[in-house]
């Protein structure tokens, strides 16, 4: 396989863009077919492609919705708005992948190249969004501000447009690109995204090692990288083996989708582990944060209340209260 060519990758993995790249055959058709792919199923006179993978996409949407709800509940957490944008983009990517994998927009349909280009655009936007999220923890600028949020959104939008445009130009043979000239597509979809992910991981390791006493977040990073790499290895190396072993009921795309979901969940766990809420602002949202564990005996309570009979405020529970910062309170 030469650099920038999809022939080897597409013969092993049933990814949507493979139907749109490659040299044209004598019949004028283009596309690279995988050596083995999951069988179709018929439901209510409708042919559905990649049934197992479609179910996993739906599970991913449900899990992403749950993660978004949990993030939104942490009103004062650092980087809350930024990480929510990441999950929204992942949800949009999952929906687009579901449309392509299930055959709602089947190969050969006029809209298929556009959906495939949008899918590539969302993939690049997701990686860029994650990269920019990686800078939030370093406090180079205040999180949640217009600068932080719009820097994230515009960067993600820019990569979405670049990746989507390069994909569409390649699929449609526009602007000097063609399905047989896929170096630009390969660089944008694979190389740049890999660089974004690598830089993000390195930055988070530096952040945890230099600023946190707790080392547990490193395990979240490790598991996230592990799941992502395993998913890619299964998709591009063992997809055909799995497909033939289970009689075409599923292929590597199912496991890649599952592993990508697990990697995203580890990103959520990592963010949650390094983010703390301000109790002063969140106490009103969590009922019964404080409770009386044990009442004082009657004799002790009376001694406390009437400790100083010369003052009508002697029984105050705030008498000689210790400050949380180590000094004496003025009260």
Curated annotation (Swiss-Prot):
Residue intervals passing through the bilayer: 51-71, 83-103, 111-131, 157-177, 183-203, 223-243, 248-268
Superkingdom of this protein's organism: Eukaryota
Pfam family, one: Chs7
InterPro entries documented for this protein: Chs7
Localization in the cell: Endoplasmic reticulum membrane
UniProt keyword list: Cell wall biogenesis/degradation, Endoplasmic reticulum, Membrane, Protein transport, Transmembrane, Transmembrane helix, Transport
GO annotations of cellular component type: endoplasmic reticulum membrane
UniProt record, GO biological process: cell wall organization; protein folding; protein transport
GO molecular function (one): unfolded protein binding
PANTHER family: CHITIN SYNTHASE EXPORT CHAPERONE (PTHR35329:SF2)
Family: Belongs to the CHS7 family.
Assembly: Interacts with CHS3.
Protein name per Swiss-Prot or TrEMBL: Chitin synthase export chaperone
Organism: Coccidioides immitis (strain RS)
Gene, per the UniProt record: CHS7
